[in-house]
């Protein structure tokens, strides 16, 4: 039988990484410059491992092989099979990430042996004073202008800069130039893909002391060169209710800001639900015929992520005081 599942985080030391992730999550590590914590991952070679309960030690791929649609839902399993379709991260940028872009499904499939593209979203958990993000172009340019600006190191002149604060949300469809910049601590929800085309990296060295590879030409085919006016996602928090944030074909994400229990019906969802705690603590309780009644409730605290199986018919998040969580599933 299944239950709400926690996984061991995969910590990634990166040249731009900071020291906030371990204390935020309440864990100890010998690693430094931890830029990312992969909370749930089906990326080959980086598959998440169940942390506790009767399934402890199994990878997310092994769960899918054994439980199939009970884990992810019928329509999800039909589309993605034994690859878990979303990658969930916490990101701590002590300095600026490279300016980059990700391909869409069509381009990634042709170029990268059938891989998926990468559409993603950011939720700002914390931001230093004057922190900002880069997302999208501030004016429409041509591919030829792009190449010249990259060669001249002036590409940053046409990338839209957004001052950010706690709670800000950005949706980044594949093809949108972007960068997380220093002083930002973020929850990221994305398609399962680790394909990144690095456009500009400030001339810095990697952790190995060598310049990091750029992918200027590969990126040119992936970039959406149009400028838009809606890079930041506006929303109004509904306390003790479901606050929709982002809905796209790859994920539907909402915010729950709770001071009292909230129960949501899941029977018609036909999808797993991911619960990411960004602040506070509490519990997640699920019901369903294939849910283990002895282990249907799991604790949840800041920095933890829980996978609610698709076979659950309801989910109740109960705060201890106040809790903020992101929930994400596939429609």
Label the predicted regions.
Residues 1-141, 201-232, 253:
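Transition-metal
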Residues 88, 97, 114, 120-123, ...:
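His/acidic/aromatic-lined binding-pocket segments of jelly-roll/cupin-type domains
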Residues 115, 126-166, 171:
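Intrinsically disordered, low-complexity linker/loop segments enriched in Gly/Pro
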Residues 152-158, 169-171, 177-228:
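An exposed, glycine/acidic-rich loop-and-rim segment of catalytic or binding clefts
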Residues 158-171, 185, 287-312:
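Short acidic-glycine-tyrosine-enriched beta hairpin
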Residues 263-264, 280-285:
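Short beta-strand segments in beta-sandwich/barrel cores
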């Amino acid at each position: 039988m299944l239950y709400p599942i926690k996984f061991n985080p995969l910590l990634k030391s990166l040249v731009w990484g900071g020291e906030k992730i371990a204390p935020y999550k309440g864990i100890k590590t010998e690693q430094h410059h931890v830029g990312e914590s992969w909370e749930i991952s089906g990326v080959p070679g980086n598959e998440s491992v169940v942390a506790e309960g009767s399934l402890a030690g199994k990878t997310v791929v092994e769960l899918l092989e054994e439980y199939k649609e009970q884990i992810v839902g019928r329509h999800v399993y039909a589309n993605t099979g034994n690859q878990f379709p979303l990658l969930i991260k916490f990101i701590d940028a002590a300095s600026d990430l490279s300016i980059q872009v990700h391909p869409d499904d069509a381009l990634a499939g042709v170029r990268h042996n059938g891989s998926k593209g990468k559409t993603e979203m950011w939720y700002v958990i914390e931001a230093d004073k004057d922190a900002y993000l880069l997302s999208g172009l501030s004016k429409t340019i041509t591919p030829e202008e792009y190449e010249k600006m990259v060669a001249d190191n002036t590409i940053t002149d046409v990338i839209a800069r957004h001052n950010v604060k706690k709670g800000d949300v950005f949706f980044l469809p594949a093809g949108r130039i972007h960068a997380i910049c220093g002083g930002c601590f973020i929850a990221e929800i994305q398609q399962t893909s680790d394909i990144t085309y690095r456009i500009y990296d400030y001339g810095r060295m990697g952790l190995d002391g060598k310049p990091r590879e750029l992918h200027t030409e590969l990126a040119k085919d992936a970039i959406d060169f149009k400028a838009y006016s809606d890079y930041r996602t506006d929303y109004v928090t509904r306390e003790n209710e479901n606050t929709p944030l982002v809905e796209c074909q790859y994920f539907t994400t909402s915010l729950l800001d709770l001071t009292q229990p909230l129960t949501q019906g899941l029977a018609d969802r036909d999808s797993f639900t991911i619960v990411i705690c960004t602040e506070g603590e509490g519990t997640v309780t699920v019901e369903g015929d294939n849910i283990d009644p002895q282990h249907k409730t799991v604790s949840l605290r800041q920095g933890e992520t829980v996978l609610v199986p698709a076979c659950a018919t309801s989910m109740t998040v109960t705060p201890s005081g106040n809790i903020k969580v992101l929930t994400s599933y596939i429609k």
